[in-house]
Amino acid sequence: MNKYYDLVKAPIITELTNKLIERQNKYTFKVAKTANKVEIKKALESIFQVKVLSVNTRNVLPQFKRKGKFEGYTSGYKKAICKLAPGQKIKILANE
């Protein structure tokens, strides 16, 4: 059970992900780089008690950033877009 909480790190909340939630019932999460689709599906079903139909994953590469004279890279991460069964919801924000 504790392993599942290590796999799913945080939800990704942007305008695009909000549209995905409203229109297609798809939720986006930042997950561990070593996680695979089967592990992500089991973790989400265990943590949120929902039925996950499909999981798509993507590795987000680090991006070069500059702030004045300082340069560096953002950290890369893996994100998972999970489609839930019809009628299922995950309460990510307090006002949902």
Swiss-Prot record:
Signal sequence annotation: none
Residue ranges the record marks as coiled coil: none
Record's GO cellular component terms: ribonucleoprotein complex; ribosome
Family matches, as InterPro entries: Nucleotide-bd_a/b_plait_sf, Ribosomal_uL23-like, Ribosomal_uL23/eL15/eS24_sf
Entry keyword set: Ribonucleoprotein, Ribosomal protein, RNA-binding, rRNA-binding
Pfam family, one: Ribosomal_L23
GO molecular function: rRNA binding; structural constituent of ribosome
GO biological process: translation
Source organism, top-level taxon: Bacteria
Similarity section: Belongs to the universal ribosomal protein uL23 family.
Binding partners and assembly: Part of the 50S ribosomal subunit. Contacts protein L29, and trigger factor when it is bound to the ribosome.
Functional note: One of the early assembly proteins it binds 23S rRNA. One of the proteins that surrounds the polypeptide exit tunnel on the outside of the ribosome. Forms the main docking site for trigger factor binding to the ribosome.
Protein name per Swiss-Prot or TrEMBL: Large ribosomal subunit protein uL23
Organism, scientific name: Aster yellows witches'-broom phytoplasma (strain AYWB)
